[in-house]
């Protein structure tokens, strides 16, 4: 790979990352809206907001569908942060 090709690859990859970041942002906001609806339903049903079993199901679901290259433990930490927010 020449330096010119490397610069082109770098710029293309950065543009793609920018696109993916916007998709992540949209998805995270949509997820938050759904979580808010769940919270409202749980209030009406007088259910606890925090359900450790459900959190474990989320982790199992995402790690079970992960085809890499992101390691399962990294993915779990990312989802822990998403859930905590």
Regions found by a protein language model. Give the residues of each.
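Domain-level signature for soluble enzymes in the chorismate/prephenate branch of the shikimate pathway
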Residues: 1-85
